C-alpha cells in the first residue's frame, strides 16, 4: 500500500481501504456470528474507543452515571480514567473523576453475590447510588491481574442490564481478536453486549487502530459529534484487513484453543508450586507470586534470557503472559521454559 502511494489520511471520507475493511469485517466477522452492529472509528487507541462508548451511552440513556468494576483498566484519558480503578493512574488526572460507581469484582469477595449486590443498589431507595446509563466490564481483567470472569457472571450482568434498562459495554481492547479463543471474548458466555470496544490487536501489525461498535438503534450521533484527525488512518485499515485475513486463513481461533491446552498442562507441571496462583484462558495467563519485588526480579531475569514480559495486578505481583497468537509451538515452549528457569533460579 505504501509503494502504491495510497492516501494515508482521509478524516471521515470514504476510501477504498476503508470500504474494503468495513466489508470484510461485516462479511467475515460480524455476519457469521449473527451480529448486527454499527462500526465507528473513534480514534487510534483503545481509550478513544471507550470515550466514544461512554459519550454515546450517556446521550442515549440521558443519565450521567456509569458503573465499572474494581480492578478494572479502561484507559488514561479523563472519561476512561474515571472508570479505571487504580489509584496510581487516577492520581495523575488533576481533576475530580466523577459520575462513576465502582462495583466489587466477583473474585474480590467470593462470598458476595455481586449481581445481587448491583440489583440491591438499583432497587433500594436508600442505596444512595444512581441508576447508570451503562455498566462497562472486561471479560478478563488483564491489567487487574488476569482475572477471568465466569460465563455465569457475564450472563448475570447481561440479564441485569436487560431487566433495568442499562446498556452493557464490553471492553475487548486487550482480550479481543481471539486472545481468549473466540474472536470476541464475550462469545464464550453466549451474550451480546449493546456496545463493545476493540483496539490493540485489531490493528493487524501493531498499527494504531480502534473500533467502537454499537447496536444500530443506538446510533443517535449528530454529524461531527465525535470526530478526530486520526480516525481515517488508511494504513491501519489496510493492516487490520490483512491481519483478519491471516487469522481466518490460519484458523487462529482454533489454534489459540489448542495452545491453551499446551499452556495449561505446562503450568500444572512446571510453574505451579506453593505460594503461586495460576489463572488464565486462551493465550492470556497470570502467574501470581508473593509480591511485586519478586515478580519484577522474575521479569528482569526473563528479559536477560530473551523474553519480554510485564507485570499486572494490584501489587504488580502477577506475571502476565501474552504470547503472540501466531507463535509456533517451539516458540511457545521456549518462552515457557524461560519463565520456568527464571522462577526456579529465584524461588
Please place each PLM-identified region on the residue numbering:
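Conserved N-terminal phosphate-binding loop of PLP-dependent enzymes in the Aspartate aminotransferase
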Residues: 1-347
Amino acid at each position: 500500500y505504501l509503494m502504491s502511494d495510497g492516501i494515508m489520511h482521509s478524516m471521515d471520507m470514504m476510501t477504498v481501504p476503508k470500504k474494503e475493511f468495513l466489508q470484510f469485517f461485516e462479511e467475515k466477522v460480524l455476519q457469521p456470528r449473527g451480529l448486527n452492529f454499527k462500526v465507528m472509528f473513534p480514534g487510534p487507541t483503545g481509550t478513544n474507543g471507550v470515550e466514544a462508548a461512554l459519550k454515546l451511552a450517556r446521550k442515549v440513556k440521558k443519565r450521567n452515571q456509569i458503573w465499572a468494576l474494581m480492578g478494572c483498566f479502561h484507559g488514561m484519558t479523563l472519561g476512561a480514567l474515571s472508570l479505571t480503578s487504580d489509584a496510581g493512574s487516577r492520581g495523575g488526572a488533576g481533576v475530580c473523576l466523577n459520575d462513576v460507581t465502582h462495583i466489587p469484582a466477583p473474585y474480590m469477595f467470593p462470598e458476595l453475590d455481586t449481581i445481587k449486590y448491583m440489583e440491591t443498589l438499583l432497587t433500594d431507595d436508600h442505596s444512595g447510588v444512581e441508576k447508570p446509563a451503562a455498566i462497562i466490564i472486561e471479560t478478563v481483567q488483564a491489567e487487574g491481574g488476569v482475572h477471568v470472569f465466569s460465563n455465569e457472571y457475564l450472563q448475570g450482568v447481561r440479564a441485569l442490564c436487560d431487566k433495568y434498562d442499562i446498556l452493557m459495554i464490553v471492553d475487548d481492547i486487550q482480550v479481543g481478536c481471539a486472545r481468549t479463543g473466540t474472536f470476541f471474548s464475550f462469545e464464550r458466555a453466549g451474550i451480546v453486549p449493546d456496545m463493545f470496544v476493540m483496539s490493540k490487536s485489531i490493528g493487524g501489525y501493531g498499527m494504531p487502530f480502534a473500533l467502537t461498535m454499537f447496536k444500530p438503534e443506538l446510533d443517535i450521533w449528530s454529524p461531527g459529534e465525535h470526530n478526530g484527525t486520526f480516525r481515517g488512518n488508511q494504513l491501519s485499515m489496510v493492516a487490520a484487513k490483512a491481519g483478519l485475513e491471516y487469522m481466518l486463513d490460519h484458523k487462529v481461533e482454533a489454534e489459540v484453543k489448542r495452545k491453551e491446552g499446551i499452556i495449561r498442562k505446562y503450568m500444572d507441571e512446571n510453574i505451579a508450586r506453593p505460594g503461586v496462583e495460576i489463572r488464565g484462558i486462551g493465550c492470556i495467563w497470570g502467574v501470581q507470586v508473593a509480591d511485586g519485588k519478586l515478580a519484577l526480579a522474575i521479569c528482569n531475569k526473563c528479559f536477560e534470557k530473551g523474553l519480554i514480559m510485564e507485570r499486572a495486578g494490584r501489587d504488580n505481583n502477577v506475571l502476565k503472559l501474552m504470547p503472540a497468537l501466531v507463535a509456533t509451538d517451539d516458540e511457545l515452549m521456549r518462552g515457557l521454559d524461560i519463565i520456568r528457569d527464571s522462577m526456579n533460579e529465584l524461588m
